[in-house]
């Protein structure tokens, strides 16, 4: 039972999530032979201010100390 978690910045609409879920599911079916009814995709929408990379929050303005 594959469970795939997609963490990304908030703001994607249902159409985008549906397309991504379909692509992920199709890939797992193709490469692992798993029945699609057992494949789950979980979307985690994260505010840019709650995500950091290279020591900086993505929600910060450039040049903010």
From Swiss-Prot:
Key word Isomerase present: yes
Domain of life assignment: Bacteria
EC number of the protein: 5.3.2.-
One GO molecular-function entry: isomerase activity
Pfam families, per the entry: Tautomerase
This protein's UniProt keywords: Isomerase, Plasmid
Regions crossing the membrane: none
Active site per database record: 2 (proton acceptor)
UniProt-listed SUPFAM superfamilies: Tautomerase/MIF
Similarity comment: family membership: Belongs to the 4-oxalocrotonate tautomerase family.
This protein's name: Probable tautomerase RSp1151
Organism: Ralstonia nicotianae (strain ATCC BAA-1114 / GMI1000) (Ralstonia solanacearum)
């Amino acid at each position: 039972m594959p469970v795939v978690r997609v963490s990304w910045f908030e703001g994607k609409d249902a159409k985008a999530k549906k397309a991504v879920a379909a692509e992920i599911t199709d890939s797992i079916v193709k490469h692992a032979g798993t029945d699609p009814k057992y494949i789950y995709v979980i979307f985690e929408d994260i505010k840019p201010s709650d995500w950091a990379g290279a020591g900086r929050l993505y929600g910060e303005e450039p040049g903010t100390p």
